[in-house]
A protein has these predicted regions:
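Gly/serine-rich nucleotide phosphate-binding loop at the start of the catalytic core
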Residues: 1-69
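Hydrophobic alpha-helical scaffolding
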Residues: 9, 60, 64, 254-261, ...
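Stable alpha-helical structural segments in soluble proteins, enriched in small hydrophobic residues
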Residues: 33, 70-81, 378-388
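Substrate-contacting helices/loops that form the catalytic groove of nucleic-acid
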Residues: 39-55, 156-158, 165-314, 395-426
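Acidic carboxylate diad motif detector
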Residues: 47-166, 303, 307
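Hydrophobic residues embedded in beta-strands of well-ordered beta-sheets
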Residues: 114, 119-123, 170-173, 200-201, ...
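Positively charged, low-complexity nucleic-acid-binding target-recognition regions
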Residues: 304, 308-426
Length: 426
């Protein structure tokens, strides 16, 4: 499996000049190739453009695989544009934009362009770039050297390095590491997760009546606060006729990303901890692929859905689960919130038995047929579990008429703290 290790780089003067040159060349190559695509009468594949531009000045300033990566990313962006146009997913899809004149873009280095030597990254500089750096900056170097962060543990083979320029002149260095995970847990126990906004994750188990709710209030609070502060400063910016973000706005964006990342990592850590505690070998997650495109929940809720990065959270769960020998599956959430998980079988979860009226208000599900009263997200989580077990030819080992009340795990400023310890059935 592939893991991404990240560390922050505050460059030396020479590193700043070399990286500034390379990341600028990435933007220029993107624009040249994008212009060609926009003005071409026929379709151009990534391979076509790589052949066409291999002698281009900006292409030759980059290592060949880095230049190819720029063209491949542009091809993916155009493919997404054509797909959105064809499927009608977006109201008015636009082709990939040009990078601003002085923009610096992320540069990708593949395996042939770098080596890890004595806890340092050695990146090969192209012949064209060596000439430019020598003429303009009197830098005579075949390689760019970057010290690895001392706290970084590279327990695998580094396949790709991406260097991301930040607004303050520093960089984030991403190392994609391939690690072998041979261990696979096989217990037959399944955890199901219903993802949401107010309740970040509601968790149920096939081998227990226990359930847990990871509270999403802090994530909402963080987004609400930064929305407000950034909006204020952007209004001032607009009144003053500034096009670029101020230093303060960029700082707020950085703080927001950091806080959201911390919360999502902590929540995913808690999920894996529970999976280990309940001896789970499979985590099944409600698939939210089309929730943002297909649903209209009102302006405020739609804003929350767009801010909340479901994909990132799921990716954190997936890679951490694999490291523990746990597989992750996705299953449609259709009708799971409207059907009763107490008396309906897995085959009955569908439009025929779905009743919106059973969901009385946020947080409460009351079944008019069997009289069951339970947490609404807990009900959804149990139905996700039932649907998955049906798919793999299994069923719940026990009835669910005596479900335990969900244990709420709340953010305490550092992590999600457990309020009680539930009994785990055998």
């Amino acid at each position: 499996m592939k893991l991404t290790k990240v560390f922050h780089l505050r460059p030396t003067l020479i590193q700043r000049i070399i990286l500034g040159h390379l990341t600028y060349c990435v933007s220029k190559l993107w624009n040249v190739c994008n212009y060609a695509r926009r003005n071409s009468d026929k379709f151009q594949s990534a391979y076509d453009q790589q052949k066409e531009f291999k002698d281009n000045f900006w292409y030759k300033n980059l290592p060949s695989q880095s230049a190819q990566s720029v063209i491949e990313k542009l091809a993916i962006a155009w493919k997404s544009f054509f797909s959105a146009k064809k499927n009608g997913n977006l109201e008015n899809p636009r082709p990939p934009k040009f990078k601003p004149k002085t923009h610096h873009s992320t540069i990708t280095f593949k395996r042939n362009n770098f080596k890890i030597i004595d806890n340092k990254i050695r990146i090969t500089i192209s012949k064209q770039s060596k000439e430019c750096l020598s003429e303009k900056h009197a830098i005579e170097s075949k390689y760019l050297w970057i010290d690895l962060d001392k706290s970084l543990s590279l327990d695998g083979d580094v396949k790709i390095i991406e260097i991301v320029p930040l607004w303050d002149g520093s960089y984030n260095v991403h190392l994609v590491v391939e690690k072998e995970v041979s261990y696979k847990r096989e217990t037959g126990n399944v955890m199901s997760i219903d993802l949401g906004i107010k309740n970040l994750a509601t968790i149920s188990f096939s081998n227990s009546v226990d359930s847990f709710i990871i509270d999403g209030s802090q994530l909402l609070s963080v987004n609400r606060y930064f929305d407000k502060e950034i909006s204020k400063l952007q209004q001032i910016n607009n009144l003053q006729g500034r096009e670029k973000n101020t230093k303060r706005i960029n700082q707020l964006w950085d703080k927001r990303r950091t806080q959201v990342k911390q919360i999502l990592h902590s929540a995913s850590n808690e999920i894996i901890s529970l999976a280990n505690r309940y001896d789970t070998d499979t985590i099944v997650i409600g698939d939210l692929t089309n929730i943002r495109e297909d649903a209209d929940y009102g302006k405020k809720t739609n804003q929350k859905l767009h801010k909340w990065n479901f994909d990132r959270f799921v990716s954190y769960i997936e890679y951490k689960a694999r490291l523990s020998g746990i597989s992750v599956e996705k299953i449609s959430e259709a009708y799971t919130s409207q059907c009763c998980s107490v008396h309906l079988s897995a085959t009955e979860i569908g439009s025929l038995h779905a009743k919106k009226s059973n969901r009385k208000h946020r947080g409460l599900y009351c079944c008019n047929e069997c009289g069951a009263v339970l947490n609404a997200d807990q009900n959804g989580s149990r139905n996700i579990l039932k649907k998955y077990l049906l798919r793999v030819g299994k069923s719940l080992r026990r009835g669910v008429v005596a479900l335990a009340s969900p244990v709420r795990l709340a953010w305490d400023g550092h992590c999600f703290s457990r309020l009680t310890q539930s009994y785990v059935s055998s």
